[in-house]
Amino acid sequence: MPVIGVTHCRKLEDYRQAVLHAGGEVRIIEPSISIESALAGIDGLLLTGGEDIGPGRYGEAAHPAVVDVEPARDEFEIALVRAARTNHLPILAICRGIQVLNVAYGGTLVQDIPSQVSSALEHRMEVPPHQSFDYAHELWIEKESTLARLMSDRLKDADTCEVNSRHHQAVKELAPGFQVSATAPDGIIEAIEHPAAPFCLGVQWHPENFWRTGEFRALFEGFLEAAKAG
């Protein structure tokens, strides 16, 4: 059974359950430990959601809408994902996680979608926990991507899928070496991947919220298969 390191966040349970139901073992990674200790004995890394990343990490001044930045977490997770890739560990990055992944490798972020992207959809759906799996908008998925392969049973019209949404930031300039694997109808980047890595995928929505019903279990199963392969 592959051991998945899951970065600590305020809402851990759905991430934990998603990994368990896909056949993995969970080890929570606290930001207080060393990078070496965090990676010891794990077969894959799952980056979780959370607060905004400090814009200084990608060379920008903070927009007024950027709040609740956690500098220590930013520093730790950026170093962690770089070390994980150096060690060829499979990586699945969710919500804030996709943003950490992009920033760690030289990309930038849209700091506030409502004020910086004209004609944007509503991406920050404020819903109670029991409705966290409600769909918010469609995605357009690149046909030859890892994401498309994993989500083939979920796609409508060959390349679209509905997802939930709870974010006000997004990938802006893509990190070198990565490719876009999904976008929202308004052009917001919703998934990225690194084609040269064994498994390195970031998604902006919250597939973990669907662990009870299994709509996105294939994402976690694909991640765990890569972790097993080592």
Give names to the regions the model predicted.
Residues 1-92, 102-110, 114-155, 159-162, ...:
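N-terminal beta1-alpha1 cap of cysteine-dependent amidohydrolase-like domains
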Residues 95:
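Conserved G/P- and acidic residue-centered "switch" motifs that form tight phosphate/ATP-binding loops
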Residues 98:
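The feature captures the ABC ATPase H-loop/switch
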Residues 201-203:
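Residue-level marker for buried hydrophobic side chains located in beta-strands
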